[in-house]
């Protein structure tokens, strides 16, 4: 498949190909996602938001270990799959999956204790606008964890510049601090790990 097609499906999975892409993303990024969830330091009474949940690899853990999980994804295909897979939790009022973007999160201010996003910042028009929305929906003292491959790695993949905007750790840190997150730090399981998880407190 050409890089532009892969990039388009990564940013907005659609139809049968989108479902396959979701499965591939889950398989390829399993360790990265598990590490991001670990950095959330989940508690049983937490209300958690995941932006761009894609194939939904984190959702079983979030649903099982917290009081409420919300997910926002721009892909109607991924939202429909999550609603079907977690129909019991949705009916019980413990989960809510919506189509949307980080620039306009469909939730009230202070609605969540924790929030995460993995491999989505390449597609955001503005880091500051996205993080400002995450800051808005997090309660004071809440935590955000942002997982991504840094620009130095992404540049080697040759993804189309009109669909991907690679980000440096410094850019992500600066944007989080600009909208009011504190204690912002980069963490990785080992110094040789390619991807980063940036953690900030509201």
Predicted feature locations:
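Short glycine-dipeptide loop
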Residues: 45, 138-143
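Class I SAM-dependent methyltransferase SAM/SAH-binding core
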Residues: 47-104
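Core SAM-dependent methyltransferase catalytic element
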Residues: 188-202
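A short glycine-rich, Lys/Arg-flanked "PGG" loop and its adjoining helix->strand segment in the class I
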Residues: 128-140
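A short acidic, Gly/Pro-enriched loop at the edge of an enzyme's catalytic core
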Residues: 103-114
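A short SAM/SAH-binding and catalytic strip from SAM-dependent methyltransferases
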Residues: 114-127
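Conserved alpha-helix/loop element of class I SAM-dependent methyltransferases that forms part
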Residues: 27-46
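Conserved class I S-adenosyl-L-methionine
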Residues: 143-171
């Amino acid at each position: 498949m050409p890089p532009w097609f892969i990039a388009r499906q990564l940013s907005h999975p659609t139809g049968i190909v989108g479902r396959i892409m979701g499965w591939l993303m889950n398989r390829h990024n399993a360790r990265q996602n598990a590490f991001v969830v670990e950095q959330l330091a989940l508690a049983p009474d937490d209300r958690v938001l995941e932006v761009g949940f894609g194939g939904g690899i984190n959702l079983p853990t979030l649903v099982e270990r917290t009081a409420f999980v919300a997910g926002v994804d721009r892909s109607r295909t991924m939202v429909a799959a999550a609603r079907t897979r977690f129909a019991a939790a949705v009916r019980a009022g413990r989960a809510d999956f919506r189509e949307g973007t980080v620039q306009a999160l469909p939730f009230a201010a202070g609605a969540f204790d924790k929030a995460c996003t993995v491999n989505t910042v390449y597609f955001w028009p503005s880091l500051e606008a996205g993080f400002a929305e995450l800051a808005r929906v997090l309660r004071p003292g809440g935590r955000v964890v942002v997982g991504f491959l840094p620009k130095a790695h992404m540049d080697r993949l040759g993804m189309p510049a009109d669909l991907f905007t690679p980000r440096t750790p410094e850019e992500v840190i600066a944007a989080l601090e600009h909208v009011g997150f504190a204690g912002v730090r980069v963490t990785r399981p080992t110094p040789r790990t390619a991807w980063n998880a940036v953690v900030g407190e509201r």
